[in-house]
A protein has these predicted regions:
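N-terminal amphipathic alpha-helix/helix-capping segment at the start of soluble metabolic enzymes
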Residues: 41-58, 200-212
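Glycine-rich, proline-tolerant flexible connector loops at the mouths of alpha/beta enzymes
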Residues: 85-115, 168-179, 246-259, 344-346
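Active-site mouth loops of central-metabolism enzymes
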Residues: 57-71, 133-144, 214-232, 309-322
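Catalytic cores of alpha/beta
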Residues: 143-152, 261-264, 284-286, 349
Length: 358
């Protein structure tokens, strides 16, 4: 209350001194609105999704290296009318890029195709006054680099993050952490927890600790592709929750029964945090194979048949939208607290789905 009162008094003094009564009233309400927006940005995700109805959120990708932010802003502005409670932004580690040299040899260079997550997160949060949730990865980052990310985010007033292991290098059979990096999300959680407690990764105390981070983790209704079975995967999810995660957000799925079964089994383990379903509209026949290959999820036969009947690109798009709408309506009837949409850089399909359910 003191925080708000201080700003109100300053607004009154400036307005009366410079502009008189009309400006005083206008500026007073402007300041109140901005402080309310600021309050939203420092709320946790579990606080933001509380209340009646099913909350809306979505994920975006940072621009490719060398590209501008305008296309990303258009994606955000397309989906703003549906009142997103927060927006996730992905983080990308370096990937191998192969270049053929003049002598016929091949050179391998590690390149981050989409840098700038922290800067873009700050730009979006302060432009749109919506909480932004950057992803923090084990993959491709050392503990010290992770610490720098946490410090940068804290300076920028971003206190919600999603902690993930991240994908393995495509050339590796198994995930390999960076030297002095984290092998598992649970190890990354331990670092964030210690940071929240006021300690750097080397054990030194942080002179001026900031607002502690609140974080979520991933859940896999069809199990993580490296898990030997669903029981093992749920045990890992439970470990992440007991380690400090306040919510889970699932990998995309296309059969709601997989989500409902996952939630039921998780609840049987005594886990009561919100589990937010992740939805991605499939909008082309090509995605029937590319999405399972990339995200290790099944596509129902009924949906596959309908998609294969569609002869034009627009017809395929509509089949995918209709399936996602049906998924969302069933999830909403079941009382899910929120639905999280994966845009993968394309807002049109999510816009068409949201238009019909929000």
């Amino acid at each position: 209350m003191t925080y708000r009162t201080t700003y109100e008094i300053q607004a009154v003094e400036i307005a009366v001194h410079l502009f008189g009564r009309f400006a005083f009233v206008s500026l007073f309400f402007f300041v109140i609105l901005q402080i309310d927006n600021l309050a939203n940005c420092i709320m946790t995700i579990t606080e933001l999704i509380q209340g009646q109805g099913t909350a809306f959120s979505f994920e975006v990708l940072p621009p490719k290296k060398g590209e501008g932010i305008e296309e990303l802003e258009r994606t955000v502005e397309t989906l703003l009318p549906y009142g997103p409670k927060y927006i996730n932004i992905t983080t990308h580690h370096s990937e191998p890029v192969y270049k053929r040299l003049d002598n016929g040899l091949v050179e391998v260079e590690m390149v981050r195709r989409r840098p700038g997550t922290v800067a873009v997160a700050a730009a979006l949060q302060y432009k749109y006054n919506i909480p932004i949730v950057p992803h923090i990865l084990c993959s491709g980052f050392t503990k010290e680099e992770t610490e720098y990310v946490l410090l940068d985010l804290q300076f920028l007033g971003i206190s919600n993050v999603l902690l993930l292991r991240g994908d393995r290098n495509p050339n590796d059979a198994m995930f390999r952490a960076e030297p002095d990096g984290h092998q598992h999300t649970t190890e990354l959680q331990e670092q964030v927890n210690r940071f929240n407690e006021g300690f750097f990764v080397n054990g030194d105390p942080i002179p001026s600790p900031g607002v502690p981070f609140s974080y979520g983790v991933a859940g896999y209704p069809e199990k993580h592709d490296e898990a030997p079975n669903i029981e093992t995967d749920i045990a890992w999810f439970k470990k992440k929750v007991t380690g400090g995660a306040t919510y889970g957000v699932t990998q995309m799925f296309f059969d709601n029964s997989k989500y409902f079964t996952f939630v039921e089994r998780v609840r049987q383990e005594g886990i009561d945090v919100p589990i937010i379903p992740g939805i991605k509209p499939i909008t082309s026949q090509k995605q029937l194979t590319s999405i399972p290959r990339s995200f290790h999820c099944d596509i129902p036969e009924e949906f596959t048949r309908e998609m294969m009947k569609a002869e034009t690109k627009e017809a395929q798009f509509q089949v995918g939208v209709e399936w996602a709408v049906a998924q969302c309506k069933e999830l909403m009837r079941a009382g899910v607290p929120s639905i999280h949409f994966y845009t993968t850089g394309q807002a049109r399909s999510v816009n068409e789905v949201a238009k019909q359910i929000y």
